[in-house]
Amino acid sequence: MILMDIKKLFGYEGKTVVVSGAYSGMGLAAARLLHELGAQVYTICRRNGRHSKLDFPAAGELYADFGAKEDIDALADALPEKIDAMFLCHGIALKADASNALEVQKVNFLGHKYLLEKALPKIADNGSVNIIASTGGYGWQDAFADCAAVVNAPSYEAALDWYAAHPDVIRNGYVFSKQCLCAYVKMKVHAPEYIDRKIRLNAINPGNTITGLTDDFNRNTSPNGDAAEGKAVIEAIFLDSWNGRWATAEEMGYPLAAIGSDIFSYMSGQIIYFDYGMSSVWETDALDAAIE
């Protein structure tokens, strides 16, 4: 039996890809694998590389604060003229007092939406857009009306106006931002700008994963800002029932790279949970409750 050429199977050799959040965690894992598979990897760093270094040679390093519209404008202009696959892996955590709720919306969702509106013409026909959302976005269907309002906002400023008019909705910042990402994938998969050029659009919803944000999540989960206390709360909710463990960044970044590849050339509009089945338990528990 002749073994398949793995690089040819993925189809990244000589292709141009862009990865945000590429300097740590899941984004770094995805970017590193994409490089190993032969892609020309352009990375986006929020801190302009001052505090982060890659462990592989990038084709180009770009900067953008995804909470700043002017940065995204500049980034869209600086991106390569042809992009075969885009991987949006960046995000921030909500503070315990929700004081950064608006910033979370801008970085975790609105920045994605605005960049894609600006940069989609550069994405090649039959290319892919691949997003890291979160299991925190579970139940997005229940928030669909609010999510759709932001997804359908006709401009960046209109979305900001909506946020300003709905402070109670965005106060749970992280959850709503990830719900919006899920809604975006479902709403846009057959939008003309995607389907007419056969650009695939998918997202993954990671479960509890050890990344650069883990300490932030732990501290912000605790009313006292205590990381150990917050970690215990998170594990009690998500891991203890099945004696589970935290995932590694590679267990999320590698599947993301695969989803954007030729292997998944017929998959689009999907939100894939990588949570060791927790979302399935929630779904069946809800169905059982409805029967009762």
Q: Which residues does each predicted region cover?
A:
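Conserved NAD(P)H cofactor-binding loop of Rossmann-fold oxidoreductase domains
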Residues: 87-94, 277
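C-terminal substrate-recognition "lid" of short-chain dehydrogenase/reductases
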Residues: 245-274, 279-280
